[in-house]
């Protein structure tokens, strides 16, 4: 029999395997790991809304009316829906000699981005079958040009057709 020194472990031999028996300190109680709540990632604006905001920057940033700015976006979306134009927002905006006020290098103004996203959401709701979504420009208006007085004139044909007279009710402040 061997005398043990303080802190030494006693061992019992059992079929050639060492088994610890006495003077063993139990392991510390483990606290379950706390998983931190994930920090919400800020929602990145979708690419189409960014393109539309850049178009608004170039085509309508000096226009005071939100309704008239929204009409620029509706004009783009009308073309997306029309068989005579590309079927994507970027395709419509980047088509040669069309939206000369669009550039992917233009800044993305937060207010213009919010307006672009709002119109895009309304258009998608309309495409999904919703009724009155707050459309400010009829579907057949595919063209616009500056009137020289800080406004755009929207038309159903490229040349010499009557300009839209703003008879639709607008969901935006004037």
Regions found by a protein language model. Name each.
Residues 42-174:
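Bacterial extracytoplasmic/cell-wall-associated proteins, especially those involved in peptidoglycan
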Residues 2-3, 13, 140:
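Intrinsic-disorder/low-complexity peptide segments enriched for small residues
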Residues 7-8, 35, 84:
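Intrinsically disordered, low-complexity segments enriched in polar/charged small residues
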Residues 7, 25-28, 66:
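Compositionally biased, intrinsically disordered low-complexity regions
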Residues 19-21, 25-41:
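Ser/Thr-rich, Proline-interspersed low-complexity disordered segments
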Residues 13, 17-19:
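Long, intrinsically disordered low-complexity tracts enriched in Pro/Ser with mixed acidic/basic residues
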Residues 1-9, 39:
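Gram-positive cell-envelope targeting signals
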């Amino acid at each position: 029999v061997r005398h043990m020194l303080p802190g030494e472990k006693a061992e019992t031999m059992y079929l050639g395997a060492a088994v610890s028996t006495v003077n063993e300190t139990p392991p510390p109680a483990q606290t379950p790991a706390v998983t931190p709540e994930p920090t919400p990632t800020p929602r990145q604006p979708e690419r189409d809304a960014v393109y539309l905001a850049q178009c608004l920057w170039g085509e309508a940033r000096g226009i005071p009316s939100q309704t008239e700015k929204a009409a620029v976006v509706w004009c783009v979306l009308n073309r997306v829906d029309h068989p005579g134009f590309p079927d994507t927002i970027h395709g419509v905006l980047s088509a040669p000699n069309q939206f000369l006020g669009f550039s992917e290098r233009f800044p993305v103004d937060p207010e213009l981005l919010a307006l672009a996203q709002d119109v895009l959401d309304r258009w998608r709701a309309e495409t999904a079958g919703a009724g009155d979504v707050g459309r400010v420009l009829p579907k057949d208006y595919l063209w616009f040009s500056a009137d020289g007085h800080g406004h755009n004139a929207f038309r159903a044909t490229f040349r010499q057709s009557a300009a839209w007279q703003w008879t639709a009710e607008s969901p935006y402040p004037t």
